Amino acid sequence: KSAFSSLLILFAIATHENTRGVVTANTDTQLKSKTWAELNKWYNLFIGKELFTYTATSLFSADKQYEKTWRIDAIPWSESNPEAFAGLHNQGNRILIIFDEASAISDKIWEVTEGALTDKETEIIWCVFGNPTRNSGRFRECFRKHRNYWTTYQIDSRTVKISNKA
């Protein structure tokens, strides 16, 4: 999942000028040590890496003129500070949102994120990854009540040839 998320981030930022995005995970530790750390690995292999700057919390345009408008940020979510997800507007461009281990991300964060996705003529790529660890919440509803709004894939690691079954 982390490798796919990383490649998606690199694809999104490299194929559309002024892409903006937010990546979060179930915990700050997951975000920093797994999701964003995996991005570092793939960024270092990325043929266009000189066009972007990677930091511990951001991936952004190396061109100073675009560093504020062409970027993807790793932002830990907090139920006490949902506003961190409220200002994600990018009229006429692209927005990327990734929720890693999404079943543990508060419904409040999902709602605030949905409210921020109102710009017309904007390409919105919202991907959520996770395991069904809870029997309620917005992630679960991606496969139930809200399944018509999402394209879903369920992958059983027991049937994947390259997974570690130890």
Label for each model-derived stretch:
Residues 1-166:
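Phosphate/NTP-binding elements of NTP-utilizing enzymes
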